[in-house]
Amino acid sequence: MTMENKPADKPVGQNGLTYAQAGVDIDAGNLMVEKIKPLVRSTRRPGADGEIGGFGGLFDLKAAGFKDPVLVAANDGVGTKLKIAIDADKHDTVGIDLVAMCVNDLVVQGAEPLFFLDYFATGKLSPDQGVDIVAGIAEGCRQAGSALIGGETAEMPGMYRDGDYDLAGFAVGAAERDRLLPRGDIAEGDVILGLASSGVHSNGFSLVRRIVELSGLGWKSDAPFQPGATLGEALLTPTRIYVKPLLAAIRASDGIKALAHITGGGFPDNIPRVLPEGLAAEIDLESISVPAVFSWLAKTGGVEPNEMLRTFNCGIGMIAVVKPEKVEEVVAALAAEGEKVVTLGQMVKRDKDGVVYKGTLSL
């Protein structure tokens, strides 16, 4: 058998290929890191006072002041709300959403958020866009009292179209072992309180985007339900972070037995996660003041009330199950932190469903 002579492989270009020519700009990444360092410093708290740039983030648990701590961890993303941020070219609030989705899941277990890490993946890194995103993450961390101790920025040409990106967040908190939630003494007659949401928060945006498409409106159009704002601005209203008011109420009273973060799946999927067998949450739908954005979505998309309740928060972003004799005390503690609290219903016996409704939702 004869071997065909082939010319040796030659590098493309006089000096060969570079990583930048392959689509990864290390210099842009380094520039972004330098720009975000002041943002990261603004989130420092007891236990975390280091700089980013090392191989791992450090946290001194002893400095946080816990006696018998249990660590609680959560991770989450922002979902297709990011597509609105990308299409509307507004990136400074989705970082708040990212933090909120993680730390709200910590506080429902009675945990104080300690530190946060983010993952930012994009097809083509824009340092200015990245700084806007991290500015939102830092703001969310400040609202939660959590330190931003590290993260990863991944520029991946070919994985994402230029301009597209995705975010993931990772949060770790701690609770004293004897203050973990939910408690085991939830009982018939316990009162259900609701804390107001700021709007759609970070769930249901595939349906939101479909409804907007059917409406014929664009992200720069005036929001029909929020005068003075564009549709993109209104729908990008960041998710509320409930950490500080809830921790204040937990510390001020022993009345809170359980908390539920109302995210994807709405009331019927999230409330039963914290309830014992044999008990259901009876919710008076007429007690909910439904924000205008949900009425617009329901009417424009022809979405039925039950579908709204299993997709969106419908105006209630957090649920608390409270001892009846401690309701006034808990409400006062929450109100002192600026929370709008509504009495939604009570715990009742059940055979099957974990949530039962009274009345109708005012859409």
Swiss-Prot record:
Its EC number is 6.3.3.1. The keyword Cell inner membrane does not apply. SUPFAM superfamilies: PurM C-terminal domain-like (SSF56042), PurM N-terminal domain-like (SSF55326). It catalyses: 2-formamido-N(1)-(5-O-phospho-beta-D-ribosyl)acetamidine + ATP = 5-amino-1-(5-phospho-beta-D-ribosyl)imidazole + ADP + phosphate + H(+). InterPro entries: PurM-like_C_dom (IPR010918), PurM-like_C_sf (IPR036676), PurM-like_N (IPR016188), PurM-like_N_sf (IPR036921), PurM_cligase (IPR004733). GO terms for molecular function: ATP binding; phosphoribosylamine-glycine ligase activity; phosphoribosylformylglycinamidine cyclo-ligase activity. It is found in: Cytoplasm. Pathway: Purine metabolism; IMP biosynthesis via de novo pathway; 5-amino-1-(5-phospho-D-ribosyl)imidazole from N(2)-formyl-N(1)-(5-phospho-D-ribosyl)glycinamide: step 2/2. Belongs to the AIR synthase family. This is Phosphoribosylformylglycinamidine cyclo-ligase. It comes from Brucella anthropi (strain ATCC 49188 / DSM 6882 / CCUG 24695 / JCM 21032 / LMG 3331 / NBRC 15819 / NCTC 12168 / Alc 37) (Ochrobactrum anthropi). The gene is purM.
